[in-house]
Amino acid sequence: MLYSQRSRPRHREVTGPQPHSVAVVAKFPSSRPRDFAILERRRHEEAREQILTFTKLNTTERVKNKWARVTDQKLLHNMVQREVYRTMEEYKMHLNERRERLSTLLEREEMAYIKEMEAMEETTLERQAKMRERVKSLREKREKERMDFIAEKRDQQFREQCEELRSLRSQIHLNEVCTERMAQIVLKEELNRQRKEEDTIFDQLWEQDRLAKEEQEEKKRQKRIELNQEIACLQKAASEAQKMQEKRLKEEESKLMAEEQRLIKLEEERNLKEKQQNKLQVKSMLEDSIRLKMKRLAREQQEELALDMKILEHVMQGYQDDTEEKRQRKMELRKEQQLYREYLAQQLEEEKRQEREMDKMIEAELEKSWAKKSEQMRKEKEARKRLMKDVMDTRRVQIQEKLERNAKLQEELAHDKELLESATEEHKQLETDRNARQMKVAQQYQRDLVSQVAYQQSQRQAEREEEQREFEAGLTAEKAYQNKLREILSRPYVGHENIHPLRRGRISSPKDWLPQ
């Protein structure tokens, strides 16, 4: 029992020297500061504010990006609409101007036609005069044609009959052909040189453009990588902070649950201790009652034994004195003893009765005292139970509030996590769309370059084919010309209709080409 008393849990209540006096031991000062809960709450609120600020900033940036994208699209759409509207207005204006010009021209033509119709109303004399004028002009024209024909025939006859003129014309024509051929070769070389220079310039420009675009793409890629790394670091930091917050909330929740279990266990131990104390008190009272009863029975037995010893001594003493007087005395003594025994029996009975009454009174007093003490203990127990219940209820309410607050914080953290994940997914989707657009633009640019190169190659091939055709046509023309020249030189006459107009002028004036 001493070990159980020594190892039982200690409480803050200590009984005093007087009945119903209880003292409360002071609590040990907490190692935490007084405003620990306030500081902890502030720290939680600051962390939550930081997460909310980050989420709000991310949402704001996403809204800004979306607004900028929509604004750019609207600006582009409005610009295209304005350009289309301006083009349509210009087209309508040009169309109206053209209609006005055509209507004005139509009016002028109608007026001219009317005037012409009015002017055509002529008399017979005017018609005869016009007919005479027409006959005269026709006669002059026919005479001019006849004179031209005669001059041509004379010139033709001169060319056919002059051998020196024929050889000189052949030499001049040959010189012109050589000069034109040399000019064609020089022009071809110049065109080839210009084309090569243009190809070189185009290659340099294309290479510079390619390098500039590669450098720009590299800068964009580095910028995207840095931005993605920064976003990944921010997401990782937010995720780590959220994990730490969740871990701290879970630890706090487990601590609160453990504290609640500890309070329940303390309440159960207190109830068990009260039951044990009640049992010990009842046992102590029963032991005290049994001890008093045993003392009383032992005292009665000792008194009876003393009385029997005294009577036995008188009897033994009577056997030693055998005189009559003594016998008589013995008889008297026996009577006295009998009376005394009866008196003692009466007194003993009276004492027993008084003791029974006293026991009853004591038991009644004990019962009354026990009832009073039980009532007092019950009241104290009820007061302690109420106090403990209030403390437990308050602590339970505090724990429940903390659990609800932790659950709310966990819900907010989960919501923030969902927002962060949605923002991350949206950023990834935007990055994917942007990469796809850039890839599409790059592919389109590559296709344009390939088509441009193919077009340039086809153009060059067409130019080479055209040059080849021109060269072949030149050779054919030269060959035909030589054949024609030989044919003309072999014939006595060459007509003017097969000579170039520029050469015809030179041939028509012999003073320009005849030697002086």
From Swiss-Prot:
Keyword Coiled coil in the entry? The reply is: yes
The record ties this protein, via InterPro entries, to: CFAP53/TCHP, TPH_dom
Tell me the compartments it is located in.
Cytoplasm, Cytoskeleton, Cilium axoneme; Cytoplasm, Cytoskeleton, Microtubule organizing center, Centrosome, Centriolar satellite
Gene Ontology terms, cellular component aspect?
Answer: centriolar satellite; cilium; cytoplasm
Q: Give the phenotype of cells or organisms lacking this gene.
A: Morpholino knockdown in embryos results in a reduced number of cilia on multiciliated epithelial cells, slower cilium growth, defective cilium orientation, and a significant decrease in the ability of embryos to generate directed fluid flow over their surface. Morpholino knockdown in embryos results in defective left-right symmetry with impaired localization of coco in early embryogenesis and of pitx2 in late organogenesis.
Positions of the region Disordered? Answer: 417-443, 455-475
Give yes or no: UniProt keyword Cytoplasm. Answer: yes
Q: Which keywords annotate this record? A: Cell projection, Cilium, Cilium biogenesis/degradation, Coiled coil, Cytoplasm, Cytoskeleton
GO terms classed as biological process: cell projection organization; cilium movement; determination of left/right symmetry
One Pfam annotation reads TPH
* Coiled-coil segments on the chain, per record: 217-283, 316-440
Spell out the Basic and acidic residues composition-biased ranges. Answer: 417-436, 461-472
Task: Name the family.
Answer: Belongs to the CFAP53 family.
**Record's function text:** Microtubule inner protein (MIP) part of the dynein-decorated doublet microtubules (DMTs) in cilia axoneme, which is required for motile cilia beating. Regulates motility patterns of both 9+0 and 9+2 motile cilia through differential localization and recruitment of axonemal dynein components. Required for motile cilium formation and movement. Involved in the establishment of left-right symmetry during embryogenesis.
Name of the protein this chain belongs to: Cilia- and flagella-associated protein 53
Q: Which gene encodes it?
A: cfap53.L
